[in-house]
C-alpha cells in the first residue's frame, strides 16, 4: 500500500474523497463544441462523468451521465495524474479496484461506449495511463505484489494487447504518481512520489523500455507527482513536488540530454510558495506552466522561458476554496479545467497567457460517491 509522508502529501490523495457539495448549473445557450470526461473511480462498477463543453467554456452534464465503464474503481484517492487518457475517439481509464483498463469509444454526442471487456492492467492497482501517437500504451501499477510499468498496443479497433517483455518492475512502496510519453513517443518517464525519484526510459520500436543511464533520477524535492513535457520542446520535462511541507511546493525542470538522461535546468527546483503542488499542465504553445496546489486550494502560473527556466507569475484561488486532483486545457487552450477536490467539482478558468479567471458558471458538481481522479478535455 502507498504511504503518506506528510499531511501535505496526503492532501493529494484525500482531496477527492470528501462529500459532494450541491452546486447548481444553469443551462447554457452557447454551442456544444466538445466534451470533458472524469474518471469517477467508484467501487463496484466504475463510471465516467461526462460534460458537454460549450463555446464559452461552460460545462453542463451530458444526458445520462455518469456512464458505467466495466471495471471497478478504488473509491479513494489515487494520488496520480493521468487516470483517464484519450487517443482519437478512444478513451482509456484505469480501474484501480479491479486491476484493469477500460477502453471506450466516445460518440459524437460525448457518450462513451465500452469497446470490450476491461483488460488486465498487468499489475496491481493501476493509477496512471499514457498513450503515444503510434498507439503504444503504458500503465503505472502501484499495488504491493504488482508495482510496475506495463506496456500494451492500442489497435485501430480499440483492442488493447500486452507487449511481450515490456513490464518493468518498480520497488514496492515507490508510489508512482504519473507515467507519460514525450511528443515523439521515444521517451517515457514515471514519477515515484513516495521515494522522490523519476524513472526515465528510451522506448524502442517494439514498444519495450530501456532505462536511461543514471535512472532513476533525484526529483530535487520531496514527492514528485505530476509531470509534463513542454510542447514543441520534447527534451524539456517539468515535475511538481508536493511533499516538502506547508509553503514549500516546487516545480523541477529537467532537460533530456538525448539518451534519456535528465539534467537540471537553471536553478531548479523553482519555488511556488504554496503547499502540495500535485499536478501540472502546460499551455499548448509551451510558454506557460500551471501548477495545481491541492492543499493551498489555488494554482500557480509560471512563464517558461526559452531556455526552459521558470519565472513565477502569481497564484489564482479557487472561488469556493476547493482543492483539486488533475487539470487539463481545452484543445484551443482558452480554458483550463480542474477536477476533483473538496466536494466533487470541476472548476474551469479562462486562460489569457499566464492569467486565469474562474468562469461565472464554475464550478459544476460531480456525482457523489467514489473519488474522482483524472480528466480528459476534448
Sequence positions of predicted segments:
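Beta-rich, blade/repeat-based domains predominating
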Residues: 31, 69-87, 120-136, 168-187, ...
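Structural motif
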Residues: 45-49, 100, 146-150, 197-200, ...
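C-terminal region of N-terminal signal peptides and the immediate post-cleavage residues
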Residues: 16-34, 41-42, 208, 353-355
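Short loop/turn segments immediately following beta-strands, especially the blade-tip
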Residues: 51-59, 104-111, 151-160, 200-208, ...
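Short loop/turn segments immediately following the C-termini of beta-strands
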Residues: 41-43, 53, 96-97, 106, ...
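A short beta-strand motif characteristic of beta-propeller blades
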Residues: 63-75, 114-119, 163-170, 210-218, ...
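Blade-level signature of beta-propeller repeat domains, shared across WD40, Kelch, NHL, RCC1
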Residues: 341-348, 352-378
Amino acid at each position: 500500500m502507498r504511504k503518506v509522508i506528510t499531511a501535505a502529501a496526503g492532501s493529494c490523495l484525500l482531496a477527492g474523497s470528501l462529500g459532494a457539495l450541491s452546486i447548481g448549473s444553469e443551462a447554457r445557450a452557447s454551442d456544444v463544441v466538445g466534451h470533458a470526461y472524469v474518471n469517477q473511480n467508484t467501487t463496484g462498477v466504475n463510471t465516467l462523468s461526462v460534460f458537454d463543453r460549450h463555446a464559452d467554456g461552460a460545462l453542463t452534464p451530458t444526458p445520462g451521465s455518469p456512464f458505467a465503464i466495466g471495471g471497478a474503481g478504488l473509491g479513494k484517492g489515487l494520488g496520480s495524474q493521468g487516470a483517464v487518457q484519450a487517443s482519437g475517439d478512444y478513451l482509456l481509464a484505469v480501474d484501480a479496484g479491479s486491476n484493469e483498463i477500460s477502453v471506450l469509444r466516445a460518440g459524437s454526442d460525448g457518450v462513451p461506449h465500452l469497446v470490450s471487456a476491461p483488460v488486465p492492467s498487468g499489475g496491481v492497482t493501476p493509477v496512471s495511463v499514457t498513450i503515444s501517437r503510434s498507439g503504444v500504451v503504458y500503465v503505472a501499477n502501484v499495488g504491493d505484489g504488482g508495482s510496475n510499468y506495463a506496456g500494451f498496443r492500442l489497435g485501430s479497433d480499440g483492442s488493447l494487447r500486452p507487449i511481450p517483455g515490456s513490464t518493468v518492475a518498480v520497488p514496492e512502496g515507490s508510489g508512482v504518481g504519473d507515467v507519460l510519453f514525450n511528443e515523439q513517443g521515444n521517451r517515457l518517464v514515471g514519477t515515484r512520489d513516495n521515494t522522490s525519484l523519476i524513472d526515465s526510459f528510451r522506448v524502442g520500436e517494439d514498444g519495450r523500455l530501456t532505462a536511461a543511464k543514471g535512472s532513476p533520477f533525484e526529483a530535487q524535492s520531496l514527492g514528485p507527482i505530476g509531470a509534463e513535457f513542454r510542447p514543441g520542446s520534447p527534451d524539456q520535462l517539468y515535475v511538481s513536488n508536493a511533499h516538502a511541507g506547508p509553503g514549500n511546493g516546487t516545480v523541477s525542470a529537467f532537460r533530456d540530454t538525448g539518451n534519456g538522461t535528465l539534467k537540471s535546468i537553471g536553478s531548479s527546483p523553482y519555488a511556488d510558495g504554496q503547499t502540495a503542488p500535485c499536478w501540472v499542465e502546460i499551455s499548448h504553445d509551451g510558454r506557460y506552466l500551471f501548477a495545481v496546489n491541492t492543499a493551498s486550494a489555488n494554482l500557480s502560473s509560471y512563464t517558461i522561458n526559452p531556455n526552459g527556466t521558470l519565472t513565477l507569475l502569481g497564484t489564482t484561488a479557487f472561488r469556493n476554496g476547493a482543492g483539486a486532483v488533475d487539470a487539463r486545457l481545452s484543445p484551443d487552450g482558452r480554458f483550463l479545467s480542474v477536477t476533483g477536490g473538496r466536494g466533487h467539482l470541476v472548476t474551469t478558468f479562462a486562460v489569457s497567457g499566464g492569467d486565469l479567471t474562474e468562469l461565472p458558471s464554475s464550478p459544476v458538481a460531480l456525482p457523489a460517491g467514489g473519488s474522482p481522479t483524472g480528466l480528459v478535455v476534448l
